Amino acid sequence: MKLGVNIDHVATLRNARGASYPDPLKAAKIAINAGADFLTVHLREDRRHIRDEDVFNLKQNISTELNLEIAATEEMLKIAKEVKPYSICIVPEKREELTTEGGLNIVNMHSKLSGIIEEMHSFDIKVSLFIDPNINQLKYLEKLERKPDIIEIHTGDYCDNPSEEKLKLITNSAEYINNLGIECHAGHGINYKHAKEIKKIPHISALNIGHSLISEAIFHGLHSVTKKMKMTISK
């Protein structure tokens, strides 16, 4: 199973003092050296953590794949075409939220998403969609004229209050996505304990993990916690 490390909150710490440190690029290189398979950053419309220059700097200077999380806006899609990351992950976004609160509403967006996927593919950029583990939403993937390359299952509800029922929803969703011939990832709120359970689910090929790793890194160092998480999901 692959590990994507989200380094947004390195930038959060930097921006808290309006400083030039800690440097997200330095964090990215440490995570890669410790075993991260790819890097993820979320360029939000309010630039609360990652900034435009961070994204360009990462793309130019890291040795692994860059996954850029963005809202489906003209501004963000334009930036994606300029940066040309390995992949983009389309996420819903509200200015007032502390973090992404849920998955995309495919029911209301399927026609728009088809156009985005086609456009990004013309720039050789893979497209991921961030979706709740809800079969009723996932069914609308079949209505898309152009299929995404990846679906990332939103694991926040499970991680906030784990239960077998919620884990089953993720399992069923991963199976459904796999049957559509789409690669399945998972992310949001995952720590070591959650990772041990989610890694058992068939068809999930990668986890995106950020806040818990950056939090643990305060006490144990980013190299150490990234290496530990990679070992956790690889066993």
UniProtKB/Swiss-Prot annotation:
3-amino-2-oxopropyl phosphate binds at N6, R17, G189, G210, H211. The record marks E152 as: Transition state stabilizer. Catalyzes the complicated ring closure reaction between the two acyclic compounds 1-deoxy-D-xylulose-5-phosphate (DXP) and 3-amino-2-oxopropyl phosphate (1-amino-acetone-3-phosphate or AAP) to form pyridoxine 5'-phosphate (PNP) and inorganic phosphate. This is Pyridoxine 5'-phosphate synthase. It is found in: Cytoplasm. Pathway: Cofactor biosynthesis; pyridoxine 5'-phosphate biosynthesis; pyridoxine 5'-phosphate from D-erythrose 4-phosphate: step 5/5. It comes from Wolbachia pipientis subsp. Culex pipiens (strain wPip). The active site is at H42 (proton acceptor), E69 (proton acceptor), H188 (proton donor). Coiled coil: none annotated. 1-deoxy-D-xylulose 5-phosphate binds at D8, H9, R44, H49, T99. Its EC number is 2.6.99.2. GO terms for biological process: pyridoxine biosynthetic process. The keyword Transferase applies. GO terms for molecular function: pyridoxine 5'-phosphate synthase activity. One of its GO terms (cellular component) is cytosol. It is an enzyme of class 2 (transferase). It holds the Pfam family PdxJ. It catalyses: 3-amino-2-oxopropyl phosphate + 1-deoxy-D-xylulose 5-phosphate = pyridoxine 5'-phosphate + phosphate + 2 H2O + H(+). It comes from the Bacteria. Belongs to the PNP synthase family. Its main location: cytoplasm. The keyword Transferase applies.
